[in-house]
Curated annotation (Swiss-Prot):
Substrate binds at residue 170. Residues 343-367 have a biased composition (Polar residues). The active site is at 197 (proton acceptor). InterPro entries: NAD(P)-bd_dom_sf, SDR_fam. GO terms for molecular function: oxidoreductase activity. Residues 1-25 form the signal peptide. This is Dehydrogenase/reductase SDR family member 13. Its main location: secreted.
Length: 376
């Protein structure tokens, strides 16, 4: 009996340690009122993204839910309007696997929204599922799509400075090892998926690092945020069906709820005084050191150039006229590199009308062009 009690006590003690070190998340403070500000949150129809959007809506922000599924995105926007009491929550279609969809979203957003104060890259995948593409789907969704979207929306972020870009990464970046000779090769099998996921999270951290360098002095700051171990759809979605009922109770005990996972991204989006820490990696609402591979500035620059090519950005744009304003290409052009053709981008929910010319002033004295993508 004594041994049984001792074992129970040890288990309880171990759980308390796990709870306070992993499960319990610090609460985000930051700016109290966000009235008059606009925030885009990708992948905001569930999990961490939805909880992030809810907190932003409660603080009065105009929140754009950028999601792939129209049905789930519109349902989430309705739920958030009801729960927050804020009618300024809308849905816009965005499929990060499709470069054409990213361009369409940017065009629709820039033509309808006069402000962009915070861009939160929350959407991501951990597995290719049953999809078999001719490119690295994990890198496309988790890094290349967000990279392109950031470039297309940077002029609006700059015009609304001080503004922020938050990239939701992961501690999995520590396992990442980028192979630039095979950066966009297809991913096959669960072992390749594990590596590709870690590589994409490393790419997130390197992107934040290089973006901070590119944006220095513009008033736009950026941060990589690790939400912690979270009991979200990203964790459960790709598990075998028979395993989910077994792991759900365990996940509830040892993983954070999505609300807890939203705290560090919210901290990076809202906390005042962290501007000098632009480009850094945050976990549990404070700066944390990254792996040696994530501190490699040469790798960050090389990834930047490689991603521009993968995103369809003109390789010679550095030599273009710096006074010429960038414009997204016609989003109706099909993409040979994309997943299935994106649906037409629409806005669901209350929206502003935007009169006058769009502010597309150049960010870094370099013109960004988007190539026409060839018809398959």
């Amino acid at each position: 009996m004594e041994m049984l009690l001792l074992g129970a006590g040890l288990l309880l003690g171990a759980y308390v340690l796990v709870y306070y070190n992993l499960v319990k998340a610090p609460s985000c403070g930051g700016i109290g009122s966000l009235r008059g500000r606009t925030v885009v949150v990708t992948g905001a129809n569930s999990g961490i993204g939805k909880m992030t959007a809810l907190e932003l809506a409660r603080r009065g922000a105009r929140v754009v839910l950028a999601c792939r599924s129209r049905e789930r995105g519109e349902a989430a926007a309705f739920d958030l309007r009801q729960e927050s009491g804020n009618n300024e929550v809308i849905f816009m279609a965005l499929d990060l696997a499709s470069l054409a969809s990213v361009q369409a979203f940017a065009t629709a957003f820039l033509s309808s929204e006069p402000r962009l104060d915070v861009l939160i890259h929350n959407a991501g995948i951990s597995s290719c599922g049953r999809t078999r593409e001719t490119f690295n789907l994990l890198l496309r969704v988790n890094h290349v799509g967000p990279f392109l979207l950031t470039h297309l929306l940077l002029p609006r972020l700059r015009s609304c400075a001080p503004s922020r870009v938050v990239i939701v990464s992961s501690a999995a970046h520590r396992r990442g090892r980028l192979d630039f000779t095979r950066l966009d090769c297809p991913v096959v099998g669960w072992q390749q998926e594990l590596r590709a996921y870690a590589d994409s999270k490393l790419a997130n951290v390197l992107f934040a690092r290089e973006l901070a360098t590119q944006l220095e002095g513009t008033g736009v700051t950026c941060y990589a945020a690790h939400p912690g171990p979270v009991n979200s759809e990203l964790f459960l979605r790709h598990l075998p069906g028979w395993l989910r009922p077994i792991l759900r109770p365990l996940a509830w005990l040892v993983l954070r709820a999505p609300q807890g996972g939203a705290q560090t991204p919210l901290y990076c989006a809202l906390q005042e005084g962290i501007e000098p820490l632009s480009g850094r990696y945050f976990a549990n609402c404070h700066v944390e050191e990254v792996s040696p591979a994530a501190r490699d500035d040469q790798a960050a620059q090389r990834l930047w150039k490689a991603t521009k090519k993968l995103a369809g950005l003109a390789p010679g744009d550095d030599d273009d006229d710096p006074d010429e304003e960038p414009e997204p290409e016609d989003p109706r052009a099909p993409s040979s590199q994309s997943a299935p053709s994106p649906e037409k981008t629409t806005v669901s929910g209350p929206s502003h009308s935007y009169q006058g010319s769009q502010d597309l002033s150049k960010l870094t004295q370099r013109r960004i062009q988007v190539k026409d993508e060839p018809t398959p």
